[in-house]
Amino acid sequence: LYVSGMLLSMQPVVDIHNTKIQDGLMPEDLKGIQTESKRDGVQIVNQIKEFLNARDIPLDKQNLMLASFSEISKDAQRDEKTQLDKEVAKLIDGEASTNKQIFTFIYHNIFLSIDAMAGHLDIMGEMYSEFLKYALGDGKEIGIVLTPPYITKMMATILDVNQDSKVMDLATGSAGFLISAMEMMIQDAENTFGKKTTSAEDKIHIIKTKQLLGVELNAEMYTLAATNMILRGDGSSNIQKGNTFRTPEELYTHFKADKLLLNPPFSYEENGMPFIAFGLDKMEKGGLAAIIIQDS
């Protein structure tokens, strides 16, 4: 969550029309001031709040994400100036807070390099997915299984996901399935209408806002999933925080999924089989599903 939040705070603040409102946070903005409103961690969280608000992300979603990102500012001691770690000694003059040191390392070693490349958000998203893979491993220790990207892409391909698909994942995790599906849907739209054309951009907007549905119970995983989508230029994806089996019925009847991508949590009863039955029941007639089933 530290890296996720810091990456978001570095992004330029833009509105729903992609008009820049203010610059993203930079290392020199973190001054190690100890007053409560100016602490480095508080500055980072406040910048995240500005970013989410400018993108017109629903308030309830903002609050859920900010509750997770508040870990960055929770410990005031991490905002006190301290001796520099050797990894940032050449990047900072004098002492700096732990939060600033982490921020500075990410800024110089990741953000600036990616920001200089074309397709900034897509590359940032790929890097973020790689970070999640190494940070969370296979997720078994916390009862969460994160599906490798090559598997999510293979399963989306098997289902022949295209620009008109309505794709659902009831155990979203870090949104790996939805990301793979979204990429295929966007590619299909660009092949049909031409890259960067008005028709393609209009269709891509519909794909991102109307054709992807994810549900995730774990608050931190929900935040990671939402951040994953945002870093790909999608702040309006329909990822819901909640219990799959207790979400309103109209969520599924209104969405009308015709593709189900699912890796149910193995720690759930019957190795997650209720997720499979529930997901198949909520699909449109003639829909297709690709599901990973636990082997024990």
Model-identified regions with their sequence ranges:
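Short, hydrophobic/amphipathic alpha-helical patches that form generic packing surfaces
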Residues: Y2-V14, I230
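Alpha-helix N-cap and coil->helix boundary residues
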Residues: G119-D122, L146, G287
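Long recognition/docking surfaces used for binding and targeting
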Residues: L8, D15-A135
